[in-house]
Amino acid sequence: MPAPPPDARSFLAQALRLVPCGGAAAILTVRAPEALPTIRASRFFMLRREDGSAPLIPRPYSIYKQRGAELDFLILRQGQGSSSLLALQAGMPVRLIGPLGNGWPDLASPEPAAPDPGASPADWVLLAGGVGSAPFYMAIEQALAGTFGGPVPAHRLHFLFGARSRAQLYDLPAFEALGVPVHTATQDGSHGRRGHVLELLESLQREGRIPATVRALACGPERMLEAVHAWSRRSGQPAYLSLETLMGCGVGICNGCPVPTDKRGPLRDWPNAKACVEGPVFRADAIELCH
């Protein structure tokens, strides 16, 4: 299996600020010692405080935004690791290891191809659940700018954001300012439509507001990704899933993040893939998820 990416590094960054963005989440901004090359959206870093007050094992976080040497991470308070990061003060050191993993595919590519060989490439729907929104801000930015391939017109990108309630639609105004269609769904009906994000997609397709044939990117809770995986299999519409998987090392050594592969898919030669190396982004037809 592949080794960790050649551009991965371990370095100390400086915490700059924490900005609340809804519920128990905040955006952590850190500054690396020097400007970093542009990083493909949905790659991640392992983060850990360096003052001895945090768990020894770092935590994986997708890059939310990048501005030269400055990196933003969307942090949700969940346990000791995230709580220690949310207690950082400006100027404190943070250990970063990365960038790690792969990222979203080139959204300007005609692949995966439409079922009709003569048809235009299908629109993309970006399905986010809660903090699963983290890898999508840069994905949209990079697609619009043509950072990795040609630019994608804004009307060909549809961002669908689902959460339990309005408070978990983290940093929603920032996504609305990107200029792509944004649709929301909440389980309690406090913002957008009531229901789950996949139900939102199917409703918008029935109404003709999103084409019947699309290509999907998805990141969110396990049950949401299982539903998107099943939808892709059922409908034949291609999807890429960015898994929110627990990781021990992030570089493929500990074997703590196995993902069962589909024996008919592109990773069929291996019984399991490593989420930190072959992922976190997988084609839906490459892996098996429990339903």
What positions do the PLM features span?
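Local cysteine-cluster metal-coordination motifs and their immediate loop/turn environment
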Residues: 135, 222-223, 244-280
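FNR/FR-type flavoprotein reductase catalytic core
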Residues: 82-246
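Short, surface-exposed secondary-structure boundary micro-motifs
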Residues: 50-52, 99, 262
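SAM/dcSAM-binding transferase cores
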Residues: 274-277, 284-291
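Structural signal for conserved beta-strand scaffold positions within catalytic alpha/beta enzyme cores
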Residues: 17, 65, 184-186, 241, ...
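Short, low-complexity, intrinsically disordered N-terminal peptides in bacterial proteins
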Residues: 1-10, 112-120, 207-210, 265-266, ...
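Ferredoxin-reductase
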Residues: 2-90
